[in-house]
A protein has these predicted regions:
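Flexible, glycine/proline-enriched loop segments at strand-loop-helix junctions
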Residues: 34-36, 99, 121, 148, ...
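Class I SAM-dependent methyltransferase SAM-binding "motif I" and its flanking Rossmann-like core
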Residues: 100-164
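Short, surface-exposed amphipathic charged segments that create phosphate/polyanion-binding patches used
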Residues: 73-80, 138-140, 164-168, 208-214
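Short gly/pro/ser/thr-enriched loop/turn and capping motifs at secondary-structure boundaries
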Residues: 36-39, 129-132, 180, 202-204
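Solvent-exposed alpha-helices and their adjacent loops that cap or buttress functional pockets
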Residues: 21-22, 88, 141-145, 162-166, ...
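Class I S-adenosyl-L-methionine
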Residues: 1-12, 17-20, 24-120, 212-215, ...
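A short acidic, often aromatic-flanked loop/helix-cap motif at beta-alpha or helix-coil junctions
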Residues: 65-70, 130, 157-159, 202-205
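A contiguous loop/helix-start segment that scaffolds small-molecule binding in enzyme catalytic cores
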Residues: 2, 165-229
Length: 229
């Protein structure tokens, strides 16, 4: 059996009991990480897993290059799939983890398509998203009653963002590291309720509603902005 386990956004206590119990009983645990141009490997998922006192011999990382060229990424997904399928065929219980929720911008989804194509048994354990934790930390509801919510990853144009702010009550912006200039052009012209969060659930967590402070920060990958009218 293959399990997709959501780890939550960073705080190790935010995993579900079901997810943690599966991790403890799994024969193999696969986790994603990032491979940078200097060949450094970093895994946010592993930093969460290390809190659970798991047998380190069960842990297997797969590392994806942090660029828009998908050649290396596709190769890693294929080789990782083949390793997992071998484990599966040998009758092992396999867990594959993802930070946040495994159904939301997760690298696991690319493996899932391969599992389904090969008719492997899979169960997904959902989890807490970063924007849900961000709203909780700032004591601010994402939406109420008939309000509408949209999630935009790596918003490319001011027009796209402006249209979202007209048509939706709450706009969650993810993957913002490279598009702060686009966001600035919009939020500097009109007043919005701005909630910025980075590295949620970790000892490096930072939260702010001051746009002048936000736009001058060095924005990390694990960051997001929530805008409300």
């Amino acid at each position: 059996m293959i399990y997709g386990i959501s780890l939550g956004p960073g705080d190790p206590d935010l995993i579900t009991l079901k997810g943690l119990n599966i991790l403890k009983s799994a024969d193999k645990i696969y986790y994603p990480g990032s491979l940078f141009s200097n060949q450094n490997k970093v895994s946010y998922s592993l930093s969460i897993l290390e809190h659970y006192n798991l047998d380190s011999s069960k842990l297997n990382g797969f590392f994806l290059e942090m660029n828009l060229d998908r050649v290396q990424v596709k190769t890693i997904y294929e080789t990782t799939f083949l390793k997992i399928k071998e484990d599966y065929d040998n009758g092992l219980t396999i867990a594959i983890v993802s930070e946040g929720d495994i159904n939301t911008f997760s690298s696991f989804s690319y493996l899932l398509s391969k599992f389904k194509a090969n008719q492997l048994k899979v169960e997904l354990i959902p989890g807490i998203t970063s924007y849900a934790l961000g709203a909780a930390e700032q004591l601010t509801p994402l939406c109420l009653q008939n309000e509408k919510l949209i999630i935009l990853p790596r918003v490319q144009t001011t027009k796209e963002l402006e249209e979202a702010l007209v048509n939706f009550d709450t706009v969650v912006l993810m993957k913002i590291k490279s598009v702060i200039a686009v966001i600035d052009q919009v939020v500097s012209k009109q007043t919005y309720n701005i909630n910025y969060s980075e590295r949620l659930g970790t000892d490096k967590q930072f939260i702010s509603s001051d746009w002048d402070e936000i736009k001058t920060r060095e924005i990390p990958y694990f960051s997001l902005i929530t805008l409300r009218k």
